[in-house]
Regions:
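Amphipathic protein-protein interaction modules
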Residues: 42-101
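N-terminal domain-onset segments
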Residues: 1-60
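Weak global preference for isoleucine
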Residues: 6-10, 32, 64, 72, ...
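Compact, glycine/acidic-enriched structural inserts
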Residues: 93-116
């Protein structure tokens, strides 16, 4: 998977809208666009990773121990993951050389997941 493919996936997610709150923003659309610019500046060359559960309820998550999960962005030691098979995004911490633990939920809303 290339960065160009990731950009297309991000644009498709953006086109669906976002549920992410922008409390206090006078121009919500401008804030969303600013968030996307910031995300694009943090894109990395996608690489496949292993995702492990941080706690028992995550063990059934669509990211845990599944193939085709890639890192697509990184900022402040937090990583944005994308599941090629489920087409969902999730934020994670790096817990090993090629091992990541989810911070929370996964959705198809790239903006909500990137903002955490």
């Amino acid at each position: 998977m290339s960065k160009d493919e990731i950009l297309e996936i991000i644009k498709a997610s953006r086109a669906k809208g976002t549920s992410s709150p922008f409390v206090g923003a006078l121009d919500r659309e401008a804030e969303i666009d600013k968030t996307l610019v910031q995300l694009e500046s943090c894109l990395v060359q996608p690489f496949t990773v292993e995702v492990v559960a941080a706690y028992h309820p995550q063990e059934g998550c669509e990211f845990i121990n599944k193939p085709n999960v890639v890192v697509i962005a990184e900022a402040n030691k937090e990583y944005l993951l994308y599941s090629i098979s489920t087409k969902l995004f999730a934020k994670a911490w790096r817990t090993g050389e090629n091992q990541f633990t989810l911070l929370g939920f996964s959705t198809d809303d790239v903006i909500a997941e990137w903002r955490g």
